Amino acid sequence: VDLERKDLSVIYFDNGPGYYTGLRIGFSVAQGICASLGIPLVPVNGLDALAFAAHTSHRKICSLIDIKRNEFAYCTYNPVPGGVVRNTDPEVISVDNLEIKITSDTEKKLLVGNWNLLNNKKIVNDSNTKLADPKFVTAEHIFNVGERLFDSDNYPNFNEIQIEYMREPDVTLPKENLVKKVNFYD
């Protein structure tokens, strides 16, 4: 990329939910660049970015991001002129619970995000649910939401930014490894 310092005034980044390694690497790189250049870092929730990018004027929007282990991050939104408003807080949901939630809701809805990874005919064939793009969060989606957050000065302080993992990692250290004493003279 042919950029100069004067070309960069802010960085927007996807702070989750998503896969651990990608989120950590993206956050670390963004932090390093912003800290070294003294520019703001604006986190954007991936579920929000998907909903904002969805094209609907009347359907409820359901955003879905795969977070592994047959679980998804899920959140619902209402379309409003010029954007979307969250209906619910983001949650971790299994495919079985998502099926119940989607099929029992008689409201017309748009399902965006990783619905193509669902191996569930009841969800994808639900008569009140329209499967739509975007299927993945893109840099353009992050930019569109991040720009609004930045322009309205609605983002956290650099030191308060956190990644939204939404669940525990796949790999953890055994508790006994964390409580052993270290002998530096061995």
Locations of the language-model features?
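Helix-rich "cap/lid" substructures immediately adjacent to catalytic or cofactor-binding pockets
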Residues: V1-D7
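Short amphipathic alpha-helical face segments that pack within enzyme cores
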Residues: S28, A49, H141-V145
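Short, well-ordered alpha-helices that flank and scaffold nucleotide-derived cofactor binding pockets
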Residues: Q31, A35, T56, R148
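Surface "functional belts" at beta-alpha junctions
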Residues: P40-V137, Y165
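Acyltransferase
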Residues: A132-D186
